[in-house]
């Protein structure tokens, strides 16, 4: 695991000066813009493969950040993450990078990536909403992607997910090379009140991105009848269609 962070960072840093991205005039040349963004893809897959829950991993990450040796497989994995992130930061500093880590929405990238068991990698570090997803593409039509028997958001819970996200951010931020994390909140689980804002400001998070609905029983807001039971909808529509016109056509 730690070796993967190092190899990934070295590949990014090597690529940085070869993209020619400044040729359009829209971006700074690589000699000026000393930034890359190494992130994480498929965390839910990795945890499943090692029989680790998000809750266990969050606790292990916190222990590692606190300098306490973690226990079991979760503790070993957390230690590998810490070692890998710190070692990758050393590589970035060799290349004089000013920023080197970022966790961003990676759905399109995840669709093109497989884990070591052949399942589609889940986007970034969050648990997915479901174990499979349909992607409707104008080019390829509807395609179904399977994540395998990973933990999904409704099973993980907000607190366990938030702890993993916070503790990973602490690890990245400790390097001094963090961009940030485009963090998706769960609108059907949390309440956006003063307490939420206060806890957010005290956390290591940098930005809120999408507001997602992750629970399986969330209403479909695309339907005007979403708040009604199906039977009520049918009765309502039938009541409109059934009555015969009550008028004197001669009038």
Map each language-model feature to its residues.
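Long, C-terminal-biased catalytic regions of enzyme "large/alpha" subunits
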Residues: 1-251
């Amino acid at each position: 695991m730690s070796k993967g962070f190092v190899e990934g960072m070295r590949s990014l840093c090597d690529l940085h000066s070869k993209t020619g991205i400044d040729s359009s005039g829209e971006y700074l040349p690589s000699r000026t813009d000393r930034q890359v963004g190494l992130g994480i893809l498929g965390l839910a897959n990795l945890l499943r493969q090692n029989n680790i829950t998000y809750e266990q991993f969050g606790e292990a990450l916190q222990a590692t950040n606190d300098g306490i040796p973690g226990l079991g497989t979760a503790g070993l994995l957390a230690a590998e993450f810490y070692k890998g992130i710190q070692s990758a930061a050393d590589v970035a500093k060799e290349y004089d990078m000013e920023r080197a880590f970022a966790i961003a929405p990676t759905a399109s990238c995840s669709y093109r990536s497989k884990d070591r068991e052949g399942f589609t990698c889940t986007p970034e570090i969050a648990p997915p909403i479901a174990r499979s997803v349909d992607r409707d593409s104008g080019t390829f039509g509807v395609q179904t992607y399977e994540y395998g028997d990973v933990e999904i958001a409704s099973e993980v819970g907000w607190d366990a997910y938030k702890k993993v996200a916070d503790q990973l951010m602490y690890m990245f931020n400790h390097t001094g090379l963090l961009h940030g994390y485009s963090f998706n909140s769960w609108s059907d689980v949390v309440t956006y009140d003063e307490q939420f804002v206060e806890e957010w400001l005290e956390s290591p998070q940098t930005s809120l991105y999408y507001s997602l609905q992750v629970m399986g029983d969330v209403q479909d807001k695309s339907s005007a009848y979403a708040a009604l039971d199906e039977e009520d909808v049918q009765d309502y529509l039938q009541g409109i269609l059934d009555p015969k016109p009550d008028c004197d056509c001669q009038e």
